[in-house]
């Protein structure tokens, strides 16, 4: 029988995903075989397993923290919003259907048995399971069909840690209120509280800690300081909170258009980590400025976001800046927008729409989603900003429902050689004649650090700057360093020994 612990929160964005990653890292460092698990994730940031199955990026980076390959069983249900009212339902890595909130709430009981079986199948292979909840367990309107918070804790018979964010204010009320709204048997599962994102003198907080412990009869097991670490976010809340608004002056200014249905903005973390890059997300025309590069990211509603791009004035501004020699890159949905036309009977209900016309490409959406990990290299002889990138290795993954057809004026961007680890030859993406526009389906493209540095040095050259002579960040290594920093901070500020002790005690009680 394995050990387990579940991390729940008083609200969304309190830091559950990061703390789960930290616990996974700690248990891995201490010699345990550990795996993360989240029964249901709602996010547009997703990734692909080595088997070509789609799952939430939060569980992927948690698996990386644990030193294991991502497994779709770690996130059996993924909800990807397609509009304010509907979401695509991905079950065990494959698209099942689209549902609105009412339909999905009615569907949840059918998922419960499958989720339980998947969890226990995974748990049998590991010493420690670290589970993550979603939002808050005190959503009393959803309690009767809960499959992700206390409902999941009961399925796994796992003790619970409750995380609260002090930075947003009202931390003691959020702790007390959450525990007060739980049923007695649910509250009994909560073995400790962690206060997250603290800034200031801990001595000023101590009286409050003593009072909340007395009021709730639940111990506070740690107070985590605000950490300036670079780890991926599972959804767009971080964008809304301005986490990625870099204001420092740096050699290169890169503007990512923040589309209403932006997907996989983690694609650009590797760019933001480079010491000579200022990366910012732009949703208003007045904020676009004069960047050195514009990026159109992926989208879960490509035509809807293309309409928004026109209505916001950003489409016209992008075209004007391109005429003034500002290069443009599109990833996935952004790539499709850069073409001449998009034909769609799948995502938006709109039949077709003209693209921005910067690439000689037409895209037709299809009901079957492509989900695959890919490897290859940048084509030889590409012009413009890609002239220094030729033959550099590329790795990443594709998640899309469209097929793009290149016209005679488009140059293929990449020669791909591996699909989900199997040898295969095909081309990806498109480049215009002067190499000022690139479109690609490869998510995670900028994680390929040799390609990224060559691209950035081309941008520097266009500005009359010398090639960068500092240390280029290898993003894969950078993430591993961030996991170690996180684990070290958690060991310092959280009573990890006590958490492990309560996990073992709970295991013994289960065995009786």
From Swiss-Prot:
It comes from the Bacteria. It comes from Yersinia enterocolitica serotype O:8 / biotype 1B (strain NCTC 13174 / 8081). GO terms for biological process: cobalamin biosynthetic process. Pathway: Cofactor biosynthesis; adenosylcobalamin biosynthesis. Catalyzes amidations at positions B, D, E, and G on adenosylcobyrinic A,C-diamide. NH(2) groups are provided by glutamine, and one molecule of ATP is hydrogenolyzed for each amidation. The active site is at 332 (nucleophile), 443. This is Cobyric acid synthase. Pfam families: CbiA, GATase_3. InterPro entries: Class_I_gatase-like (IPR029062), CobQ/CobB/MinD/ParA_Nub-bd_dom (IPR002586), CobQ_GATase1 (IPR033949), CobQ_N (IPR047045), CobQ_synth (IPR004459), GATase_3 (IPR011698), P-loop_NTPase (IPR027417). Belongs to the CobB/CobQ family. CobQ subfamily. Keywords: Cobalamin biosynthesis, Glutamine amidotransferase. GO terms for molecular function: ABC-type vitamin B12 transporter activity; catalytic activity.
